[in-house]
Amino acid sequence: MAIVLGIDPGSRVTGYGVIRQQGRQLTYLGSGCIRTVVDDMPTRLKLIYAGVTEIITQFQPDFFAIEQVFMAKNPDSALKLGQARGAAIVAAVNLNLPVSEYAARQVKQTVVGTGAAEKSQVQHMVRSLLKLPANPQADAADALAIAITHCHLSQNTLRLGNDQMTLSRGRIR
């Protein structure tokens, strides 16, 4: 059994989702958003760090999964996203959580079946996979999808002694 915290980072809204994995069964534990309503970037980063720390303390996850930075058309947006990711990652590392990173296309491919999925498709599949009564809000759904991706991909990882091997298309890499 493992508890996984997924994070969808953002400088204004950071989504989080927490699930429990027991074998192939996934159970929803919680989700939501950390909203930073101030304009001052250092204060936003402090709020993200504090929010993620609080979530980790509340749910006691075993694993921390976060979306990788993608290259946006606006370099300023990419830098702010990177800073938000950094604040969340530092919170996890300070509490000794192992950090895994996943590309947005990889998350969509894992959860929906296509890397070009729309946000509404991700929300629908997260609702279906976790048997939720309604679609979660978009940022929380993305965070839950990141946690689901971590669970799915960790099932395809074999640990042999100190070596780690990953199954890819039926082959060990």
Swiss-Prot record:
It catalyses: Endonucleolytic cleavage at a junction such as a reciprocal single-stranded crossover between two homologous DNA duplexes (Holliday junction). PROSITE patterns: RUVC. It is found in: Cytoplasm. Keywords: Cytoplasm, DNA damage, DNA recombination, DNA repair, DNA-binding, Endonuclease, Hydrolase, Magnesium, Metal-binding, Nuclease. GO terms for molecular function: crossover junction DNA endonuclease activity; DNA binding; magnesium ion binding. CDD domains: RuvC. The keyword Transmembrane helix does not apply. Binds 2 Mg(2+) ion per subunit. Its EC number is 3.1.21.10. It comes from the Bacteria. The active site is at D8, E67, D139. Mg(2+) 2 binds at E67. The keyword Nucleotide-binding does not apply. InterPro entries: RNaseH-like_sf, RNaseH_sf, X-over_junc_endoDNase_Mg_BS, X-over_junc_endoDNase_RuvC. Homodimer which binds Holliday junction (HJ) DNA. The HJ becomes 2-fold symmetrical on binding to RuvC with unstacked arms; it has a different conformation from HJ DNA in complex with RuvA. In the full resolvosome a probable DNA-RuvA(4)-RuvB(12)-RuvC(2) complex forms which resolves the HJ. Belongs to the RuvC family. This is Crossover junction endodeoxyribonuclease RuvC. It comes from Yersinia pestis. The lineage of its organism: Bacteria, Pseudomonadati, Pseudomonadota, Gammaproteobacteria, Enterobacterales.
